[in-house]
């Protein structure tokens, strides 16, 4: 097994003689931070890691400033997988599951039967976009690839793997016509890179560095690998956001909540477990227009 840099990163590459680009992602530290917040069973942790890798790949592919959200829902053992990744490459994720229904070695269709996958882009400026596709693939890689078959003119394929310690992803995408103009040659070139990518095993994907993976797959094709782009875990929760949620209740309801909770309202972030506390003084200050800064404790 190769040593990895001490950061998580995505890395783009292109084929010099065909109209195909690619992206690789390696997540270790951010994946560990997400799993440290919630002790997921191994099959759930694997699915969440794959979805984190997918989100990181998509942020490197889709040009926007804002937030990308991948949300998978089902009526099965895992009713929710959710990952958010900002255009600044800050990542967080969460899963909901019924422990009694999660079995060892379970895959996507075992855990999320009849599920759906929503891809949402929430730009800092402009209109929010959402697309939804059925989780009908054998795994998340196939389901996400199916989404792009339905919604994109350019071919896009995903390979995603996670083992509870490391999450890896590979994306291949056709580019507009430039290097190859003949339609049959263009299709053959696309099938060539996909066929080779399909030979990559989970052990290789999780254990090899990017240069070795690309040499293993495409040593006969001229490929250019670009610089790494760091990615990290960061939760976007804050005391201010929690206070805004409290303010939306109105003064009377907020004061009643303080009374019902023995003098202190606790607001927990579902992603990182950060807890924000608001007492009667905080509530009065909030509705008096005094802001949300206070000496009230917060804790993880």
From Swiss-Prot:
GO terms for biological process: protein refolding. One of its GO terms (molecular function) is protein folding chaperone. Pfam families: HSP33. It is found in: Cytoplasm. Disulfide bonds join 235-237, 269-272. One of its GO terms (cellular component) is cytoplasm. The keyword Zinc applies. Keywords: Chaperone, Cytoplasm, Disulfide bond, Redox-active center, Zinc. InterPro entries: Heat_shock_Hsp33, Heat_shock_Hsp33_C, Heat_shock_Hsp33_N, Hsp33_helix_hairpin_bin_dom_sf. Gene3D superfamilies: helix hairpin bin, Hsp33 domain, HSP33 redox switch-like. The keyword DNA-binding does not apply. Belongs to the HSP33 family. This is 33 kDa chaperonin. It comes from Pseudomonas syringae pv. syringae (strain B728a). The lineage of its organism: Bacteria, Pseudomonadati, Pseudomonadota, Gammaproteobacteria, Pseudomonadales.
């Amino acid at each position: 097994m190769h040593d990895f840099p001490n950061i998580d990163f995505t890395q783009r590459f292109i084929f010099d003689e065909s109209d195909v680009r690619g992206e690789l992602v390696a997540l270790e530290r951010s994946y560990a931070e997400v799993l440290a917040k919630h002790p997921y069973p191994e099959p759930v942790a694997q699915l969440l890691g794959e979805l984190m890798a997918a989100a990181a790949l998509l942020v490197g592919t889709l040009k926007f400033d804002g937030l990308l959200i991948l949300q998978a829902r089902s009526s099965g053992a895992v009713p929710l997988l959710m990952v958010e990744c900002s255009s600044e490459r800050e990542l967080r994720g969460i899963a909901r599951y019924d422990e009694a229904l999660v079995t060892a070695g379970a895959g996507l269709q075992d855990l999320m039967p009849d599920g759906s996958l929503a891809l949402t882009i929430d730009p800092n400026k402009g209109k929010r976009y959402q697309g939804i596709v059925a989780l009908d693939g054998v795994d998340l890689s196939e389901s996400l690839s199916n989404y792009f078959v339905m919604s994109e003119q350019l071919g896009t394929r995903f390979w995603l793997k996670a083992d509870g310690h490391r999450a890896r992803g590979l994306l291949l995408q056709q580019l507009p016509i430039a290097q190859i103009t003949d339609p049959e040659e263009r299709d053959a070139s696309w099938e060539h890179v996909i066929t080779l990518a399909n030979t990559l095993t989970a052990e290789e994907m999780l254990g090899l560095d990017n240069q070795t993976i690309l040499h293993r797959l495409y040593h006969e094709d001229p490929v250019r690998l670009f610089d790494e782009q760091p990615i990290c875990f960061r939760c976007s929760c804050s005391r201010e956001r929690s206070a805004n949620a409290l303010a939306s209740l109105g003064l009377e309801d907020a004061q009643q909540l303080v009374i019902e909770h023995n003098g202190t309202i606790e607001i927990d972030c579902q992603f990182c477990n950060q807890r924000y506390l608001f007492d009667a003084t905080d509530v009065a200050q909030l509705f008096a227009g005094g802001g949300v800064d206070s000496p009230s404790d917060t804790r993880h």
